[in-house]
Amino acid sequence: MLMPKRVKYRKQQRGTVRGMTKGASLVHFGDWGLKAMESSWITAQQIEACRLSMVRTLKRTGNIWINIFPDKPITSKGIGTRQGKGKGDVEGWVAVVKKGRVMFEIGGVDEATAKRALEYAASKLPIRTKIVQRYEIGGEL
């Protein structure tokens, strides 16, 4: 699973996910990308499930770029534990994804294969997504 090697603070507040992404809204590395149409948390397990489904679809051809990383710790208190006595233990890691962010990119394969791989990856995610194509400067492919 993806997780940071070390962090400055072990626990974070939850915060809110509002607004559009500031960067990473275009496909930069590959030819096709999977763009988030909603804001949400994406867990490390969901990212790994997407990666595996894309790798199995591509079958040793093409390249995959993962543009999100789970760097936010999520805590929870044990079942049957009363409130108080401090914040719970870290249970997992999530990536904060805002609307408009390109999360995954694929390159080096034909259009049909890339779209099929990204559709499989999208089915593993809890948010609405859109498959986008890379455009060169000037609007041409």
Curated annotation (Swiss-Prot):
A GO term, aspect molecular function: rRNA binding
The keyword RNA-binding is annotated on this UniProt entry: yes
One GO biological process term: translation
Assigned keywords, A-Z: Ribonucleoprotein, Ribosomal protein, RNA-binding, rRNA-binding, tRNA-binding
Coiled-coil spans in chain: none
InterPro entries: Ribosomal_uL16, Ribosomal_uL16_bact-type, Ribosomal_uL16_dom, Ribosomal_uL16_sf
One GO CC term on file: cytosolic large ribosomal subunit
Xref: SUPFAM superfamilies: Ribosomal protein L16p/L10e
Source domain of life: Bacteria
PANTHER family for this protein: 50S/60S RIBOSOMAL PROTEIN L16, LARGE RIBOSOMAL SUBUNIT PROTEIN UL16M
Subunit structure: Part of the 50S ribosomal subunit.
Similarity comment: family membership: Belongs to the universal ribosomal protein uL16 family.
Record's function text: Binds 23S rRNA and is also seen to make contacts with the A and possibly P site tRNAs.
Protein name: Large ribosomal subunit protein uL16
The species this protein was found in: Petrotoga mobilis (strain DSM 10674 / SJ95)
